[in-house]
Regions:
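Structured beta-strand-rich core segments of catalytic domains in phosphoester-bond hydrolases
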Residues: 1-79, 83, 151, 251, ...
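Intrinsic disorder
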Residues: 16-20, 46-53, 66, 80-92, ...
Length: 316
């Protein structure tokens, strides 16, 4: 199918070091114009945490009708269930790139989508939805909740390599700001005190590194509920084999406010206050039982091991 004939423009980013796949975002050129495209390469020499070839892509689009624009971020994070530290660091870099591109998410809302290789209610999911995470002491295999037990490796406070120049707030440190921290004894003392302070989500320091905590400024909500109301079964977006189905693909969108609640391993957002982007509907997903009855994935109707996610928004 020729997407150009259908009226779409495409931004594509190939994975690094010659990998043939990558991330692509298509948009209707009669509806939107591209204001900026930002490529996110997670690969960076100098650390075993940044030597993977996954990528992300962020587009700032504006309606041709003249309304204010919005951003769409698309990514495919590392699969390896045992390396939750790498997945989390890739997510940190993506959020830092979004922070750089979107100074105010209320006037410039964000749609965040892709294959995050993390299950609902995992620590990765909670970080996106809550806006903060205490990662110090987490077991690597538990971060994405794709595999439990058997691991004996835990995250230390030094998750973010210094050469990334990203703070615990998922924000790039400007060179002059880094120099200011180095020169000022007062700020340097505050800087180091974050390593041991018992922060909660309502404590959001302006800048810190190696505190054992992460924050980001966006109020993100999943467009899917991760269970099927008509059957009460969990949703499925991918099937690696006939016995292993799960949700790893998501479409999040930024809202003006929400209450985040976590209870008994389940995570929910309540009292969501939508902003300029309003959720109108979504294409329903299937359960593992229903996919199995259809012949598992991939099959003739769905030639991929992932199910498509389709969401309808109103931009105001």
């Amino acid at each position: 199918m020729n997407t150009v004939l259908l009226g779409y423009e495409c931004e594509y980013l190939q994975r690094t070091r010659g990998k043939v796949d990558g991330c692509a975002t298509f948009y209707k050129k009669d509806k939107f114009r591209l204001e900026e495209a930002r490529q996110v390469h997670y690969y960076q020499e100098g650390s075993s945490l940044t030597n993977r070839d996954n990528v992300g892509l962020i587009l700032r689009l504006s309606p041709n009708s003249g309304e204010q624009g919005f951003c769409v971020a698309n990514t495919h994070l590392l699969y390896n269930p045992k390396r939750g530290d790498i997945k989390l660091l890739q997510l940190v870099k993506l959020m830092a790139e979004l922070d750089h591109m979107v100074p105010n998410f209320q006037s410039n809302p964000v749609i965040l989508c892709g294959d995050f290789n993390a299950r609902p209610h995992s620590f990765m999911y909670k970080f996106i939805s809550q806006g903060y995470l205490r990662y110090h002491g987490l077991q690597l295999e538990d971060i994405s909740a794709q595999r439990h037990g058997g691991g004996r490796k835990f995250l230390d406070i030094g998750l973010i390599p210094s050469n990334l120049t990203i703070s615990d707030q998922c924000r790039y440190l400007e060179d002059h700001h880094v120099e200011m921290l180095r020169r000022s004894p007062v700020l340097r003392g505050q800087f180091h005190s974050y390593q041991s302070s018992p922060y909660h989500h309502f404590h959001y320091p302006q800048v810190s590194q190696n505190s054992g905590f992460l924050w980001h400024k966006f109020h993100m909500v999943s467009t899917y509920k991760h269970f099927i109301e008509r059957t009460g079964e969990p949703e499925v977006t991918t099937q690696s084999n006939a016995a292993d189905s799960s949700v790893v693909d998501y479409v999040f969108y930024s809202v003006d406010g929400r209450e985040s609640k976590s209870r008994r391993g389940n995570f929910n957002n309540r009292n969501v206050i939508e902003g300029r982007i309003k959720l109108l509907g979504r294409l329903g997903l299937l359960s593992q039982r229903e996919i199995k009855s259809a012949g598992n994935l991939p099959n003739f109707q769905n030639p991929s091991d992932h199910m498509p996610l389709l969401v309808k928004f109103l931009l105001t």
